[in-house]
UniProtKB/Swiss-Prot annotation:
GO terms for biological process: microtubule-based process. The lineage of its organism: Eukaryota, Metazoa, Chordata, Craniata, Vertebrata. PROSITE patterns: TUBULIN (PS00227), TUBULIN_B_AUTOREG (PS00228). A motif (MREI motif) lies at residues 1-4. InterPro entries: Beta-tubulin_BS (IPR013838), Beta_tubulin (IPR002453), Tub_FtsZ_C (IPR008280), Tubulin (IPR000217), Tubulin/FtsZ-like_C (IPR037103), Tubulin/FtsZ_2-layer-sand-dom (IPR018316), Tubulin/FtsZ_GTPase_sf (IPR036525), Tubulin_C (IPR023123). Tubulin is the major constituent of microtubules, a cylinder consisting of laterally associated linear protofilaments composed of alpha- and beta-tubulin heterodimers. Microtubules grow by the addition of GTP-tubulin dimers to the microtubule end, where a stabilizing cap forms. Below the cap, tubulin dimers are in GDP-bound state, owing to GTPase activity of alpha-tubulin. This is Tubulin beta-6 chain.
Amino acid sequence: MREIVHIQAGQCGNQIGTKFWEVISDEHGIDQAGGYVGDSALQLERISVYYNESSSKKYVPRAALVDLEPGTMDSVRSGPFGQLFRPDNFIFGQTGAGNNWAKGHYTEGAELVDSVLDVVRKECEHCDCLQGFQLTHSLGGGTGSGMGTLLISKIREEYPDRIMNTFSVMPSPKVSDTVVEPYNATLSVHQLVENTDETYCIDNEALYDICFRTLKLTTPTYGDLNHLVSATMSGVTTSLRFPGQLNADLRKLAVNMVPFPRLHFFMPGFAPLTARGSQQYRALTVPELTQQMFDAKNMMAACDPRHGRYLTVATVFRGPMSMKEVDEQMLAIQNKNSSYFVEWIPNNVKVAVCDIPPRGLKMASTFIGNSTAIQELFKRISEQFSAMFRRKAFLHWFTGEGMDEMEFTEAESNMNDLVSEYQQYQDATVNDGEEAFEDEDEEEINE
C-alpha cells in the first residue's frame, strides 16, 4: 500500500501532529493503546498508509517526533495518545533552539539530525511502496523552522523521487510569539521553495478569526486552533486513507495543483464550520458545503482569495453524496466566479470524493487552493524582515551560530522573487504569452 511517513518537528509541529494522530486514530477506530475497536472493514482497508501493524495486532503510527528540548515530548508522552507512538521514535535534544533558526539548522539541529534520519530510514524500510513524507512544523520558531527545513533537505537527498509535503504554520500579522519570527520564516521559505512539493500554509491569525467569527468561541485556546488544523489535515489525507469514488494521492494532488514548481504554497479551508449553537439551523447539502468552502472566511491562511486568482483548486468531499451534484456545484462556482480563476488553465478544479465522513458530521469538505493571493502572506513577512534587517537588529544571534549575512540577503531576494512570480501569473492572460515571446526576441536583438 502507498505509505506515508510522518515527521513532526518543534513544539508547534508536535502539538499539531499529535492532534492529527488523535483525529485519524478516532476515524480508523484505533484506541489509545493502539488496539482496533472499530466497527467497519473500511477502517482497516488502507490503514497501512499511516500505521504499521505490530506482531501483537497493535497499530503504531509511522511517525517520527523531533524536538530540541524534552518538554513538548514529555507532554505528548503523558498525553492521552502518548502510548500509541513507538518509544524509539521520540528524538529530542536537551538544549532547545531558543527560537533561533541558525541553532535549529546549523548547530544544535545538525547534531541531532542523523539520529532522526535513522528513524526515518527505518520507517521507510518497513514500507512496501513509500509514497512520500509529511512534516508538521511552524516557521516562526527555531526547531520547526530551522531543523525542519534541514530534515527536508536531507530527506530530499536520500529520497529524491518521493513527494515531500509540509503543513507549515506561518507567523501571523497580528499575533506574534517571537520578535525574530520574520527572520526565521524568511530563511525557512527560502528552503521550502526549493525542497518541497506541496506546502499547506496555515496561519494562527486566520484560525483565531475562524474561532471568533464562525465558531463563536470567546476565548479560543491553542487546542481549538490545533483542532481546526487537524480537521484540515485529516481532510487532505482522506482519499489516501479511505476508499472513495474519485481518489487522489500526494502525487496526483501535486500534479494537479502545481503549475510551476516554485508555486506550491496552498491555502487550505474546511467546511462545515458552524457554531455549536446554530448547528441545528443549517442543512448540510452539497451546495451549502461548496458555498462555505470557497468563502474567504473559511481560509486557514490570513490571505483574501478575492485579492488574487486561483491557479488551481483541489477539493475533497466526504460523506455519502451524489457525484453528479458535486460536479454541477463545482461547475457553477467556476462559471459564476470565473474572474477569480486564471483562464489559461481550463478546468482547474480537481474533485475527490470519499464515502466516509469525519466523526460527528454527515458530510464535510476540504478545500485546497493554489491562489496568487498567498503572496500577501509572503509580502507581509518580507516587510517585517526588511524593517529589522535594514538595522541588522538581532542578527548577532544568527551570525554567532556561524551564519553569514549573505544568507539573509539571498533568502530575502528569493522570497521577493516568489512574490513577483505570483503577481506575474495573476496578471497573465491567455494571449499575452505570445507577446512575452516577442519581447524576449527583441531583447536578444538589442543585446
